[in-house]
Design a protein with these regions (language model features):
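Active-site substrate-binding loop(s) of clan PA
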Residues: 22-27, 61, 77-80, 102-107, ...
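Active-site region of chymotrypsin-like
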Residues: 31-52, 118-127, 151-245
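Catalytic-histidine neighborhood of serine endopeptidases
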Residues: 57, 63-112, 207-212, 216-219
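Bacterial N-terminal signal peptides that target proteins for export
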Residues: 1-7
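N-terminal signal peptide c-region/cleavage motif recognized by signal peptidases
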Residues: 16-18
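A conserved glycine-rich beta-strand in the N-terminal activation segment of trypsin-fold
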Residues: 24-25, 45-71, 191-192
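Envelope-exposed proteins and targeting segments
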Residues: 32-34, 56-58, 64, 84, ...
Length: 246
């Protein structure tokens, strides 16, 4: 059995997930309209370049009614740019709307960055959320959003650590689960905010850590053991660090 970090949590519009959990750490009404599913359906030119792929789905949160934040690899996978406006579908529960977006900037000094996306039209019911400036402490409880079937659902977890060396240096590690399901954070959750118990964004989900078990029927993906981290995130404080546009 060996461990690996899944490099992309983007939902390729082909997959689904399952689950349900205790999120008593924070009043979920406080988080209403703060987080949206985002989908870009590719045009013919993009589909010709990637046959069989019709679009990309991820998650984002409102920094303001005209700005959303997601993981940089989500923006890259959607082929967004700083110059050209491209249409995204924003989904908030049963409500959805199409809005043109472009990259305002990429923030962070590590391999995975955060992407601020500018909306051409303001979202009237958007709830801008506060950013946590101070670092989390080990065992701090958190809440984030899973994206089974492209429908956001709150799930709970805890903060584990900020690695200071190796390939995960500069990230924030969490253990996120829903009941016995340690694979609840999966395809589509990239870009989801991780909230502390005061409803402030502390990090943004980037990747998931899993293990691979060899079986007579092929390799099977299984979760990491209980008590160990299973989600890699980008600390939100990177929004205040070096940024670039590209």
């Amino acid at each position: 059995m060996r461990g690996r970090t899944c490099p992309v949590l983007i939902f390729l519009l082909l997959l689904s997930a399952q689950s349900r959990a205790d999120t008593g750490c924070v009043d979920l009404a406080q988080l209403a309209h703060s987080t949206v599913g985002i989908t870009r359906y590719f045009d013919e030119a993009d589909r010709n370049a990637q046959p069989g792929l019709v679009g990309i789905h991820g998650t984002a949160w409102f920094q303001s009614p005209t700005t959303i934040v997601t993981a940089a690899h989500v923006a890259s996978g959607m082929k967004l740019s700083t110059q050209e406006w491209k249409s995204l579908k924003l989904e908030d529960g049963a409500d959805s709307q199409s809005i043109s977006v472009r990259i305002r900037r990429l923030a962070g000094g590590h391999a995975e960055k955060l992407a601020e996306l500018e909306l051409q039209t303001a979202v009237s019911n958007a709830r801008s959320v506060a950013i946590r400036i101070s670092p989390l402490a080990p065992e701090d409880r958190v809440v984030t959003f899973a994206s089974p079937n492209q429908r956001l659902r709150a799930v709970a977890g805890r903060f584990v650590q900020y690695p200071d060396n190796g390939r995960l240096a500069g990230t924030a590690l969490f253990e996120i689960y829903e009941g016995d399901n340690r694979l609840v954070i999966d395809h589509g959750a990239s870009g989801a905010p991780v909230f502390d118990c005061e409803g402030r964004v502390a990090a943004v989900i980037s990747t998931v850590i899993t293990q691979t078990l060899a079986t007579p029927f092929g390799e099977m993906r299984i979760p990491t053991p209980w008590g160990s981290p299973n989600v890699v995130s980008v600390p939100v404080q990177q929004l205040m660090e070096f940024s670039e546009a590209q």
